[in-house]
Structures are given as C-alpha cells and as structure tokens.
Amino acid sequence: VCDHDYTAPKYHFDRGVYDKRIYNGWGSPEPETALRFGPNIKDWPQQPELTDDLLVKIVSYITDPVTTTDELIPSGETSSFRSNPLRLAEFTLSRKDPAYVGRAKAVKALDEARTAGTLPEEVQAVYAALEKAGYKPNAAATNIGSAIFANKPGDGSAREQAASCQRVLGGAANFAKEYATKRYRSNCINWGMLPFLSLIHI
C-alpha cells in the first residue's frame, strides 16, 4: 500500500554539461590538436630484437604441477594498470614468487650494459667458461635475458599479459616440461620469448 501520491517531476536534459567536457570531432577535425593521454596510459617500452645467440638466466623455478596465467600475472587490483605496461609488470608472479621482478630486472640490467658496450663481471665469467668449453661467444650478437622454469605454465584464461609482462621485464625464454595451452605458448612467441621444452628438471 502506497501512502504517497506520485507526481512525475519535470526533467530537462542539459547537454551543455557534456559539450563542455567531450570533444566531438565529427565533421570538424582539429589535426593540430595534440592527443592527451591519461596519467596511467603509457607507451610500450622498446624491445630488443632477437640475436643469433641467447644467454639466459633462470630467475624463477616453479615446481607446481600447473602454473596458471592468473599466477603469472594476477587480475583484480592489477586491472587499473592494463594500459601501463611497466607498472603492470611489477605484479608479475607477485603471488607465487615475490622476488621474481627484482631478479628479472637485474638480468635486464646486464643486457643493457652489454648493449652500452660494457660486460659486467658476471657475464665475463660466463663467457670465460664458454670459451674454455670451446665456444666463441660474441657479445654483440648475444642477448642476455631472464627466464622462468615451470612444469606446465599457461593454464587458465587467455591472458596476453601473462607473457607480455615477462617480456617487459627482460624475459627472453621460458623452460617447461610442457605448456598448458597453445595460446600461452603462442603469446610467448608473439612477444619475442622462446618457449623451450625441458625433458628434465633444470
């Protein structure tokens, strides 16, 4: 039972509120006007091309039977950074291996030093061991990148960021006994990471 009389209030739509805030370029382009991005929309960082050889350091070793894309890059609180690749990458493996990001960045710094013409002592030691084994490494043609080992990574949603976040942090490869889905393996390839298969534990 309603004890109030209902009267429809008069409503007037004032589109001026929207006209002042939204640019409508239909029929009146302004090519000289610069596009302004929001504070959390960033360009993708430049990625190095694959070289003839690759020096890889495994920075995360995951022994779970399956590793999901949600473990590789969590959803939820990270969604607000989906247009900020570097900021989003800070959450990579945060629930599975919180130290991963720091270790991956350290390896990326080695490659940046190599590109700048400096070989850190850690890399020199590896090259010396390779030369002793009969190899002749060429620093100019050898990327240095990080990698993860997981038994079966990539299960779950087709989350492209599960691969792109690794790449942004300097990821160059993954090692796995098998890949949970073709789409995750394909995403790794599309982002320039080599999806190696390992028949034994590394």
Q: What are the residue ranges of the model-derived segments?
A:
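Fe-S-dependent hydro-lyases/dehydratases of central metabolism
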Residues: V1-I200
